[in-house]
Every structure is written in C-alpha cells, then in structure tokens.
Amino acid sequence: MNPRRQKRLGIILAILIGVSATIGLMIYALNQNMDLFYTPTELVNGKDDGTKPEVGQRLRIGGMVVMGSVRRDPESLKVRFDLADVGPKVTIEYEGILPDLFREGQGIVAQGVLKDATTVEAFEVLAKHDEEYMPPEIAEAMKKTHAPLQYSEEQKQGSGQ
C-alpha cells in the first residue's frame, strides 16, 4: 500500500470513529434527558404494555391534587400531597415554592425521580389550566384598551353577493 492511499485510509477511519463517537454520545444524552409521562394509575399498575418505571428513574406524572392531602412543613418549603386520576393515589414530595395556580382539586404535572413504588420526589411542579385561562392583570388591561366591537346590520347579515 503506497503512503498516499494509507493516509486516505487513516483520514477516513478517523472520520468514521469521530462520527460514531458523536452519535453514541448524542444517544446517551437523549436517554439521560428523556422523561416518560405517567398517570398515577400507570405508575402503580404499569402501562398497557406492562412496563413500570424503576426506582430512581426520572419521570413526569400528571393528575389531580387530592382534596385535603396537601401537607406543608412549617419550618421549610417542603410540601407533600397526593395525586390521583381514576385509580390509586401517588404521593408527591416537593421542596420549593409551588406555582400560583396550584391548589387542591387542580390538575398538575410533576417532574422528578421515583423514590419508591408510590412516591415521587419532584424537582418541578407545573400547574395546568385550560386554554381559556388569562391572568387577571392581562384581562384587566384588555378591558381598558379593547372596546367591544359594534357591528352594523349589514355586517351581521354578511355580504350576500
């Protein structure tokens, strides 16, 4: 093999090794950051295909905060509450300031780590609201600046052409 061909082969091998390493690192990073979504029933009973998360696995869980289940530690920001859908309850432990929309009976999504079969240690809690929600400040500002539209009879009838 002449030196020119040997140099080309070395460059091609280096490029292939570099691309393979890059793809491998990207797949590893995506697997580390992938959080699977569960409902409380799926967390306890498993998904339809029978898969259940392992203790220590990162996940997202969504459901309704059970009425009367919120327990706050008076000496810290620790909060424990139960989350349920139509089946079993799951306990969420969170340390931090809860969102303004958080309340009992409200839908939330918590992101965290599975501590045991029915307990999730959350590091983020998101309160859910419907698409018609508008913060009070914005609603008030819109009332001041946007007058209701007045339509003529012709506009209400539409152009009959």
Curated annotation (Swiss-Prot):
Keywords: Cell inner membrane, Cell membrane, Cytochrome c-type biogenesis, Heme, Iron, Membrane, Metal-binding, Signal-anchor, Transmembrane, Transmembrane helix. The keyword Metal-binding applies. SUPFAM superfamilies: Heme chaperone CcmE. Residues 1-8 are cytoplasmic. Pfam families: CcmE. Residues 30-161 are periplasmic. One of its GO terms (biological process) is cytochrome complex assembly. One of its GO terms (cellular component) is plasma membrane. The chain crosses the membrane at residues 9-29. InterPro entries: CcmE, CcmE-like_sf, NA-bd_OB-fold. The keyword 4Fe-4S does not apply. It is found in: Cell inner membrane. Disulfide bonds: none annotated. It comes from the Bacteria. Heme binds at H129, Y133. One of its GO terms (molecular function) is metal ion binding. It is a single-pass type II membrane protein. NCBIfam families: PRK13165.1, PRK13254.1-1, PRK13254.1-3. Heme chaperone required for the biogenesis of c-type cytochromes. Transiently binds heme delivered by CcmC and transfers the heme to apo-cytochromes in a process facilitated by CcmF and CcmH. Belongs to the CcmE/CycJ family. This is Cytochrome c-type biogenesis protein CcmE. It comes from Vibrio vulnificus (strain YJ016). The lineage of its organism: Bacteria, Pseudomonadati, Pseudomonadota, Gammaproteobacteria, Vibrionales. The gene is ccmE.
